[in-house]
Amino acid sequence: MSQDRLPQMVISIMLLANFDVSERCNIRPRSFDLIAKKGDNLVIIKVASHIDSVSADITWDLNLIARYLEATPLIVGERARDTDLERGVVYIRYGLFALNPETLYDYFVEGLSPMVYASPGGLYVRIKGDLLREVRERFRMSLGDLASHLGVSRRTISKYESGMGTTLDVAIKLEEIFNAPLVETIELLGYRTPEPEKHLESTPGDVLADLERMGMEIHAMRQAPFQALALFDRHTILTAYGTSQKIVKRASLIGNISQITKTFAMCVVTDYKKQKKIGKTLLIGEEHLHTLEDGSELIDMINE
């Protein structure tokens, strides 16, 4: 089966949902495959047939890029361990949402939010705790009464009312008892990843150190097509660096991604002494970069 089938399916779904979609990232290693934008919603997507192949380094990049671009990170795949991903179910990989293409289609094209999430032990849903308490009291039913109906403890009912997840069977029984929609939907676009742990990343060569000298906040990537996010005065610069042979393959892709994400793109070339633009991407020699005094000079050059 073609390796392009799944990525092309994901691209088609996002286009069908009227998203602008970036060029597909074909550079290895890569922590994401495409970025899509519609209005204020920005989605960064990693496509992997088997979601267990998505490493901690990949999710580190996805988390970091999503946080600083105010995007939603998603993993789209077909299998986990030895089973197919189920339609309408959200899985978790290193804290990020993972789902199959059908669930992606249902959410972005049909507007149907998933309700079920996979966790060790099976499939679960999250209960609307405040609503459960409200309808239970309206029915004049005590914690003990409801616990007896469900065959669980009073403490468990109290936890449901605090938002604890439960099995599908219990959720169905609750909705039948009270005739109320008690299950929370999972809003993929509203999801924000946890604050990443602070790690001192190594900065190969002098390029990132030079950018820091110019007053920029630097976040090094591990497997992204750009090696760093450089932040300066409300501007974000997708930054790659290396020899001209390596950079030429990245310049166009990074420029395309910057257009979708409304950011800047820059490639620092270690064996080049001048500067020029390839599309929206600034190519600047490492020696030339070293002569700049602060980030505003670099922003002006990118804007030229």
UniProtKB/Swiss-Prot annotation:
Keyword Metal-binding found: no
Residue ranges annotated for the HTH cro/C1-type domain, each copy included: 132-189
PROSITE patterns linked to this entry: HTH_CROC1
DNA-binding region: 143-162
Pfam families tied to this protein: HTH_3
Source domain of life: Archaea
Single GO MF descriptor: DNA-binding transcription factor activity
Protein name: Putative HTH-type transcriptional regulatory protein Memar_2347
Source organism (scientific name): Methanoculleus marisnigri (strain ATCC 35101 / DSM 1498 / JR1)
